[in-house]
């Protein structure tokens, strides 16, 4: 393949205003799809009702304690290639805080194809879990994965944040929030979670520091009057708040 002169022009060294050498400029990042703005646009469909990307299903496995989940994922849903590190950390942290025991009500907000709610439901079959998402493709996958893994204690519902369950209250609400949907959506999840928790109910959030953990922590503390970092690993933080 013959490179055009314009390509080599883009590879010439660049210097910022303060004289710091810049090897790769924005045009190169754009050419290879690595610009953060482009990545944000690419990921925005995860919180759309109807993803406009072509379906391409695949199967993955996820092991938690003595439970093995076989999951179908697809293009247009979050973390289609594997259960992401943040969700895995949230699942393990929650199960450490709350080993299998008496029946509790749990909401999994932004459930995607279902790893969080299904893993907890499989390990703790006495709990009643409501899984919520706005993405119809993700919801269909979650239903398929529920059936395939015989997790009978979960209900899957279409919902923008927690709007569909405004008549219910929960003991625990868990979320790996859709960061790319924007701060307004993420903060709305926190606000509605506060309203939908029982007194002494608990909110669990996984979020990366570089993707807004400090502002999320501040917002949650404003709502709940308390927030605690109960786990952190590889830049991911688990925030916990208790409704007083």
Identify what each model region corresponds to:
Residues 232-244:
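Core SAM-dependent methyltransferase catalytic element
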Residues 200-207:
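Conserved beta-strand signature within the Rossmann-like core of class I S-adenosyl-L-methionine
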Residues 208-223:
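Conserved class I S-adenosyl-L-methionine
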Residues 21-23, 28-66, 75-80:
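N-terminal auxiliary segments of SAM/dcSAM-dependent transferases
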Residues 187-199:
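A short glycine-rich, Lys/Arg-flanked "PGG" loop and its adjoining helix->strand segment in the class I
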């Amino acid at each position: 393949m013959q490179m055009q002169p314009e390509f080599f022009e883009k590879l010439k060294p660049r210097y910022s205003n303060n004289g710091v050498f810049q090897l790769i400029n924005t045009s190169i990042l754009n050419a290879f799809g690595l610009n953060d703005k482009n990545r944000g646009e690419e990921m925005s469909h995860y919180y759309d009702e109807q993803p406009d990307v072509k379906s391409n299903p695949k199967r993955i496995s996820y092991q938690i304690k003595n439970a093995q989940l076989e999951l179908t994922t697809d293009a247009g849903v979050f973390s289609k290639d594997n259960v992401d590190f943040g969700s895995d950390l949230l699942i393990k942290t929650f199960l450490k805080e709350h080993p299998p025991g008496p029946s509790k009500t749990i909401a999994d907000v932004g459930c995607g194809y279902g790893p969080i709610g299904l893993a907890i439901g499989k390990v703790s079959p006495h709990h009643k879990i409501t899984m919520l998402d706005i993405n119809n493709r993700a919801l269909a996958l979650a239903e398929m994965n529920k059936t395939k893994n015989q997790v009978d204690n979960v209900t899957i519902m279409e919902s923008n944040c927690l709007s569909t369950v405004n008549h219910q209250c929960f003991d625990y609400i868990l979320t790996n929030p859709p960061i790319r949907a924007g701060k307004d959506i993420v903060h709305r999840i926190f606000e509605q979670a506060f309203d939908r928790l029982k007194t002494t109910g608990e909110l669990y959030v996984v979020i990366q520091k570089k993707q807004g953990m400090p502002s999320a922590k501040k917002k949650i503390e404003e709502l709940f009057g308390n927030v605690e970092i109960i786990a952190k690993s590889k830049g991911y933080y688990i925030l916990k708040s208790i409704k007083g």
